Amino acid sequence: MRALVVVNPRATAMSPRERDVLAHALGSETDLEVVETENRGHAAALACRAMRNGTDVVVALGGDGTVNEVINGLLTDGVHDGVPALGVVPAGSTNVFVRALGLPNDPIEATGALLEGLRSDTYRTVSMGMADDRYFCFAAGLGFDAAVVHGVERQRRKGKRSTHVLYARVGVAEFFRGNRRHPRLHVELPDGTRFDDVYFTIVANADPWTFVGNRPLHPTPETSFDDGLGLYGRRRMGVVGMLWSMARLSGDNPRVGRRGAHVLHDLEGLTVIADEPVPFQVDGDALDTRDKVTFRSVPRAIRVVGVPLETG
């Protein structure tokens, strides 16, 4: 079995020594190549090359941004039988994708699950979302949520570490900086339904949307990797209402947090139109501003290697 490990050397949760241990362990099971990324887009290029060269498994070692790039590289030519399986060793700050799948968030435990999955030939085939020409594995957004991602990215370029505290600080600043009086987004569904009162959108391919520490946030709790896309379109931006909803979305009954929002699930697609270009993000990666994005669900897009965590 031929395998490629795509390593983000800037990943925060794994030391060089631990990466060497991972490579040694995988090398005992596969014909292994390990490559470190050098710049933005490099992970996608490496994954695309591996797909076209007939590699069996591509492992993303990094955070959700690295995983997203690898997925886009693997699916450069669309969904087909020759797409390598995806393995993930989480080494970012939040690691939403693996946690939503029920895989270990610890990189050493994740390596063990990956090896066991390869030995036992255990895979799960999951859907992906697509935003225009970009695949995403768990969520994309326009407006406030994307503005927070853009703000955090600006702070990281200044040398700040990506932490939950940083996200909270940027989130508060962006909330009070933004236009909370007039909605700027419009959502169009395939059946002709249109919402014209939306301040920001989260388009989800999985649940949860993200984590605050160990607490998951569930704006679209009925969305899964086995179905279509979920939509959370916020239509009220009052301070009290937002705080109430955010608190409920992390509780035992997240449906209570739907007040003030359009919440839909299992959508084949949708289009979001903005009155003017607004911040846009996919899988926590800040992209250029957009005034229109078309989303669609891509069923059974990719096989993920691993054994889910045992419960009980």
Each language-model region and where it sits:
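ATP/NTP phosphate-donor binding region
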Residues: 1-58, 68, 304, 311
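Catalytic core of DAGKc-family lipid kinases
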Residues: 6, 16, 37, 75-200
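Short beta-strand/turn micro-motifs composed of small residues
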Residues: 7, 62, 233-235
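Glycine-rich beta-strand-to-loop/alpha-helix junction loops that act as flexible
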Residues: 9, 61-63, 89-91
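Short glycine/serine/threonine-rich phosphate/pyrophosphate-binding segments
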Residues: 43, 65-70, 96-97, 126
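Glycine-rich phosphate/pyrophosphate-binding beta-alpha loops
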Residues: 141, 145, 202-218, 286
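Gly/Ser/Thr-rich active-site loops/lids in small-molecule metabolic enzymes
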Residues: 156-166, 208-238
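ATP/nucleoside-binding phosphotransfer catalytic cores, i.e., glycine-rich phosphate-binding loops
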Residues: 189-190, 218-226, 233-312
